[in-house]
UniProtKB/Swiss-Prot annotation:
Name listed for the protein in its UniProt record: Phosphate propanoyltransferase
One Pfam family hit: PTAC
Cofactor(s) needed: Zn(2+)
Domain-related comment: Formed by 2 beta-barrels, each is capped on both ends by short alpha-helices.
Entry function: Involved in 1,2-propanediol (1,2-PD) utilization within the bacterial microcompartment (BMC) dedicated to 1,2-PD degradation by catalyzing the conversion of propanoyl-CoA to propanoyl-phosphate.
UniProt KW keywords: Acyltransferase, Bacterial microcompartment, Metal-binding, Transferase, Zinc
Recorded family membership: Belongs to the PduL family.
Organism superkingdom: Bacteria
C-alpha cells in the first residue's frame, strides 16, 4: 500500500500537467467520468438520513465547492434496485438522480436525456436511505454530455454557454462526440462531463485530454 502523501503528490503532479497542457492549447480539455449519483434537497436529506442530518465530505471534485459524500442510497424502480449510489454535495433546491441508460433497464424506468436541472417530466423512482425513503415522481435523468468552462477559456475558444461543439477523441477507440453543450460561468473549472457508458465507448478515463472543435 502506497502512503497517502505519495498518492496525493502524484495526483497533484498529474493535475498540474493537465492544467499546463490546457493553458498551452485551450482546445484541450480534461475529462470527468460520472457514475450514477444523487443530488439531494434538504427535505429529502432529512427523510433519508434523519432530521438535520448533514453530508460527510469524502472527496473534493474539480468543480469548485462540489464534493462526493460518504453517504449512499439505494434506488428502487419497478424492476429492481441499485444499491450504494453515491450522494454528491452540497445539497440542492431539488433532488436530482443521474443514471445511465443501462441503469434504467435495471430499474425498469426510461429516464430522458437532459441537461442538469431540466427535471420537468423526467422519470421517477424510490430513494431509500438508512432513516427512511422518498418516492420521487420526477427527478431522474440521463445527463447529456457537456463541458464546464472557465470564462477565459470560453473566450479563447470563441464559445459561450449553450453553444454545441464537437469533441475529438484520440486512441484505439477514438472518434468524435457531437452535440456537446458548453456551460460557462465564473464558478466553473474547465472539464468535460460524460457518463460511464460514453467513457467506455471511447476508451476514456478521468483526466484524459480531448480536443474541442467548433461547429
Amino acid at each position: 500500500m502506497f502512503p497517502q502523501s505519495l498518492i496525493d503528490r502524484i495526483l497533484a503532479e498529474l493535475l498540474a500537467q493537465d492544467v499546463a497542457a490546457t493553458d498551452t492549447d485551450p482546445a484541450l480539455v480534461p475529462v470527468g467520468v460520472s457514475n450514477r449519483h444523487v443530488h439531494l434537497s434538504r427535505p429529502d436529506m432529512d427523510a433519508l438520513f434523519g432530521p438535520g442530518a448533514s453530508l460527510t465530505r469524502m472527496k473534493a471534485m474539480k468543480q469548485p465547492g462540489q464534493y462526493a459524500a460518504a453517504e449512499t442510497v439505494t434506488l428502487r424502480g419497478p424492476k429492481g434496485d441499485i444499491g450504494k449510489v453515491r450522494v454528491l454535495g452540497p445539497l440542492r433546491k431539488e433532488t436530482q438522480i443521474e443514471i445511465s441508460v443501462a441503469d434504467g433497464f435495471t430499474l425498469g424506468i426510461k429516464p430522458p436525456m437532459r441537461m442538469s436541472g431540466k427535471l420537468d417530466g423526467s422519470a421517477g423512482l424510490t430513494v431509500i436511505g438508512p432513516a427512511g425513503s422518498v418516492t420521487k415522481e420526477a427527478g431522474v435523468i440521463v445527463a447529456l454530455r457537456h463541458i464546464h468552462m472557465r470564462p477565459e477559456d470560453a473566450v479563447r475558444l470563441g464559445v459561450k454557454t449553450g453553444d454545441s461543439v464537437d469533441v475529438v477523441v484520440s486512441g484505439p477507440r477514438g472518434g468524435v462526440m457531437h452535440n456537446v453543450t458548453i456551460r460557462s460561468d465564473e464558478v466553473s473549472a474547465t472539464e468535460m462531463h460524460i457518463d460511464v457508458e460514453e467513457a467506455n465507448a471511447f476508451g476514456l478515463q478521468n483526466d484524459a485530454l480531448v480536443r474541442v472543435r467548433k461547429v
